Amino acid sequence: MKLRLFAFALTLVCLLSFAGMTVAQDAVPVNEGETVITLENGVVGTLNVPESDSPVPAVLMLHGFASSRNEVGDMYLRLAAALAERGIGSLRIDFSGWGESAGDMAESTVSGMVADAEVALQYLQSLDGVDASRLGILGFSLGGGITVFTAGENPDAFKSMALWSTFGNLRDIFIEELTQENFDAAAANGTVEIDLGWRMVTLGNGFFTGLEDFDYQTEFPNYTGSFMVVAGSEDGSADFLDWYREHAQGALRASYLVPGADHIYNVLTEDQTLAEATIKATADWFAMTL
């Protein structure tokens, strides 16, 4: 299938298609209080804390493979605005080696991404303006896997979780998408350069071997808070909606199949209906559960 784990890394295509981001950006207000921060491990993030007389809930947002913190079509930027309108803060980060964060892409691993997420979590927990007892976490595709692993390793940290376009076994899906040939090349040479069609990426063997560092079937049940999973009907991640909903341990659980949507909710088309529906449903979910 097309448009899976790395498809929403088409931010460059989005910029070209929309001539300076007119479609995505014109619909999204620039929120006061949004600042770019650098965490202790060199991870860069964008913090959005709406004005409030009391500490606000907040959502940690984790991007997918070969993407960055604003996500394709600025979906995370737009979601941050929607959350702020509901009185919810957010922190979206670039994983080490991606976006503006420090580090070498070729040294990127699943374990490293989880570590980055944990540093971001600790930062949110330390903020006076954020209610550390009302934190949520969201992941998009590979970021969804990192979300599952982060929450599984920190089961008491998050009150609510949402997944976008998230699969199950990471090794299986990456073999299908990146091919066994690239797995073998990385094992033989230490790194492999892959042309994704819109950008080049250089991955180290540690990325491929690290896909088995965590088991989603083991980690996911550790999380016991509220849970929502979202997928487009035209994407393979829809096959996992039932599994995630049925294995969620919290009292409040939901799945949302977006009819006609692909892996990135058709955000690179002129019609933003499905992308906006996904953003609204997610913002409403966190407003209800945080």
What label would you give each PLM region?
Residues Q25-S54, A275:
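N-terminal cap/lid segment of alpha/beta-hydrolase-fold proteins
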Residues V43, G145, G152, A157-M288:
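The alpha/beta-hydrolase serine catalytic core
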Residues S68-A80, F95, F240-L241:
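The serine-hydrolase catalytic nucleophile loop
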Residues A80-A102:
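Conserved alpha/beta-hydrolase
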Residues G139-F149:
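Glycine-rich nucleophile elbow surrounding the catalytic serine of serine-hydrolase chemistry
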